[in-house]
Amino acid sequence: MFYAFKDFEKKETLLIGLFKKSRLYGKAEEIDRLLNGQLSQLLKDGDVSSKKAKVSKIFTPSLQGVKRIYIVGLGREAEFTFEDAKQCFAEAVQLIHKDRKQELTVMLDSFVSEEVPAADAAHALAESCMLSCYEVQDYKHRSNVPDQCLQSVYVLTDHDLKEIQASLHVGQVYGNATNSARTLVNMPGNMLTAADLASYAAELAAKYEFECEILEKAEMEELGMGGLLAVNQGSEEPPKMIVLKYQGKETWDDVIGLVGKGITFDTGGYSIKTKSGIVGMKSDMGGAASVLGAMEAIGELRPEQNVLAVIPSTDNMISGSAMKPDDVIVSLSGKTIEILNTDAEGRLALADGLTYAKHHGASVLIDVATLTGGVVVALGTETTGAMTNHDPLYQQVRQAAEEAGEAIWQLPITEKDKKRVKNSQMADLNNSPGREGHAIMAGTFLGEFAEQTPWVHLDIAGTATTAQNSCFGPKGGTGVMVRTLVTFVERFSGNL
């Protein structure tokens, strides 16, 4: 889809970036000459905006073979960042996509600044193209008119073509993997059961030559996975413990464990959700989607790391056999848990997932989960909540998130918090100490299963979906944390 080259070839559609108080230069200046100074005159007359992410459209009948030029404002060059580049590309490409253009030539060097070298600009372009052109895969009857979409992007640059092509590939992989996670999150619960999620993971494993293990209910019972099994008690759909193993080193050490919550629909159980709260609970497997999206990118990029993905999956339903408040269950770790709230089910499944990842050699753990409404109250819908038992690991995750352009914010774990999750007359732990500090209580509970293993918890309840369309795509699943996880895996030093 992306092709880097040095010599300008006349294509129907061109995209140029324009900094504030800038003139046309390089390849853009060459095109201006072919247009007899039309672009520079429009710039001089103020008919083309350099305001950040503002897109101007110019028709060019005088330039044979080139029908339309899009110019996107980039703002001040000294303030232009990698995230700005992604936004500007996304705004422009989304408009070009809506105009049903199938080919595009991008003057890459017009987007280069001191903060954004050519390779980064190429990554931003490819990632933004994939994200901004994403469309929800719905189940509506369609007309017989075939959809037209952007098929080929030609990247014109004076920089090293091999380096630019490599960056375009990485950006495309990041975007595609994020979109894969979005599609999973958007799928209805009746079309994405735990078995369906396991089949998807198995297909991913076959494509990228991962080792794949799918534990069935009988095997879980034999191992004593009381957390996941308790959540599954009310369901007619069998649970699955999904395990993918990618070995990028000669020996199985310094293993990164990625654990994703795979609750394919959450009624809340007997602690049933409200009418407004239950709609949208098909997305309660957002953590699993993020982990699977990350594994797709890892399969494409083949980093020299060892990665273990663990996804405990089921739905949380109501029936005569469903778990009840006051029940006591025994987790895979051997720790007992008193159930005070059946809607605090994700942490039960994750408890077994974290333990299973440790049993299979995980040196560090990162769990991703749409875990609590409390994190949405605390941090809103743009920032993912994070908790940890190991600050050096958290700093690596934070740096990866910053590089990927995904906001996270650390919440505390205190000794008083630990006492609250241990406050039970009947068991080692309780699964819901109360509404106060709800997001913190959930993370603290998970920390009891990470134990001494370095661990970071990412609560994406507020960020896994969006209610607004944006330049990065339609409302629905966001694929949040896919890019953070992949960046973390690629950068992980192992020195903690």
Curated annotation (Swiss-Prot):
EC number: 3.4.11.1, 3.4.11.10
Enzyme class: hydrolase
Residues that coordinate or bind Mn(2+) 2: 261, 266, 284, 345
Protein's UniProt keywords contain Hydrolase: yes
Subcellular localization(s) per the UniProt record: Cytoplasm
Substrates-to-products reaction catalysed: Release of an N-terminal amino acid, Xaa-|-Yaa-, in which Xaa is preferably Leu, but may be other amino acids including Pro although not Arg or Lys, and Yaa may be Pro. Amino acid amides and methyl esters are also readily hydrolyzed, but rates on arylamides are exceedingly low; Release of an N-terminal amino acid, preferentially leucine, but not glutamic or aspartic acids
An example Gene Ontology CC term for this record: cytoplasm
Gene3D superfamilies associated with the record: Leucine Aminopeptidase, subunit E, domain 1, Zn peptidases
Cofactor note: Binds 2 manganese ions per subunit.
Domain of life: Bacteria
Pfam families: Peptidase_M17, Peptidase_M17_N
Active site: 273, 347
Cofactor(s) the protein requires to work: Mn(2+)
Amino acids binding Mn(2+) 1: 266, 343, 345
Protein name according to UniProt: Probable cytosol aminopeptidase
Organism from which the protein derives: Bacillus licheniformis (strain ATCC 14580 / DSM 13 / JCM 2505 / CCUG 7422 / NBRC 12200 / NCIMB 9375 / NCTC 10341 / NRRL NRS-1264 / Gibson 46)
